[in-house]
């Protein structure tokens, strides 16, 4: 999704008879504004807060079972870029964790890439080496999850994913993943086209210009 916007917008300008919708795009309201080019994205920070609560419950369980002390409730976050979307996401996640375990602390590491399996796995491994007992991510590969699954040591390292379930690659360490369900958006987009309406006028949610 990220990075496709400029190219798709160029194509949309050449084909005004077709509606183009780019999830996670950010240029629909930039000049030239096209009536057939749209961006959409979910309020993923809300899902990340819920995932943080789940992570906090696991940390609390580990504390109560004597696996870690409250001071050892350290979480690591594999982040792609220092964008507002990423920062709001890990902030929401951290607040969710601390709503259950107030003593929890966090380490962040930016990879400067959305999709690099080996780098994301290495970053997660380094965070684990710095005593993080739970890893989450705002990046696109399974690298962090596999790092948690393969981590040795006496303390298990759990994982909270993004965009997809990680249970296949981390069956003993994956807790939950935050994902955006675009089905409603595209159902309403189709409805809008069938009834001659503007897509954003048919979305029951926050919209701004060509963005929903």
What residues fall within each predicted segment?
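A residue-level marker of the well-folded mature domains of exported/periplasmic proteins
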Residues: 1-212
